[in-house]
């Protein structure tokens, strides 16, 4: 079982607990009484196989959070040469570069938080 696998009853939210967007997603799920668990990259880690699963679902370009502080502080050469072949290694080394939260459940995939998308996915 990879890190992005989601069982039938428990929704796993992948992200970082102090991220405002993750907080919004967690609040929305709690407000709608949807059972969930946070998988915090800082606490629980993140492996390359899991990143590969997310990349297959969303594409590497959609996993990179170019609005993050980590992106702004990333070496310019890494930014310029970032490609499909290098992205997963860069993301594994810098998990705060991953757009969040990520939820995969029974064929549904969500990245980021949009109340409208969550409403459609969970109702």
For every predicted segment, state its role.
Residues 1-9:
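Short, Lys/Arg-enriched N-terminal segments with co-localized hydrophobic residues
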Residues 8-10, 98-99:
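A structure-centric signal for secondary-structure junctions around beta-strands
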Residues 9-32, 36-41:
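Local sequence-structure signature of Cys/Sec-based thiol-disulfide redox active-site neighborhoods
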Residues 41-123:
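Thiol/selenol-based redox catalytic cores and closely related redox-interacting motifs
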